Amino acid sequence: MVVAPYLAVAIGGSLGAMSRYLVTIMAQNAWGIKFPYGTLLVNTLGSFLAGFFLIVLVGRFSAEESFRLFLFTGFLGAFTTFSSFAAESLFMFEQGYWFKLITNILVNNVGSLSMVFIGTLVAKYVLLGHQGSN
């Protein structure tokens, strides 16, 4: 059995989970707990990073398999959180917070999809944009 892929996922996952916790705490300190800003922030930021690194590391530089596992499956998989998003949405539903619920669902989904797209555009600009001016 090859240990390297499992170790890459474990280390990336540990760092991603710790980063998610820190971002969530910082968001709660900045904006309070009336809306799950921390979850929204990690999901949209993680989506941007996924789009960016998909182009840079996979498309352009063909990163090693173990590094892709570390970053995408490990770090970004643990940094972003669909389960927290779902649990927070269920809480809003059960409490009858309809506006917050709809806002949470729309902003997380549309925001995350948009950020993946924007991440790919930024990566393409960084990689190709400067070549066009030479």
Curated annotation (Swiss-Prot):
Its main location: membrane. Pfam families: CRCB. InterPro entries: FluC. HAMAP family: FluC. Na(+) binds at G77, T80. It catalyses: fluoride(in) = fluoride(out). It is found in: Cell inner membrane. This is Fluoride-specific ion channel FluC. Na(+) is not transported, but it plays an essential structural role and its presence is essential for fluoride channel function. Fluoride-specific ion channel. Important for reducing fluoride concentration in the cell, thus reducing its toxicity. The keyword Ion transport applies. One of its GO terms (molecular function) is fluoride channel activity. Belongs to the fluoride channel Fluc/FEX (TC 1.A.43) family.
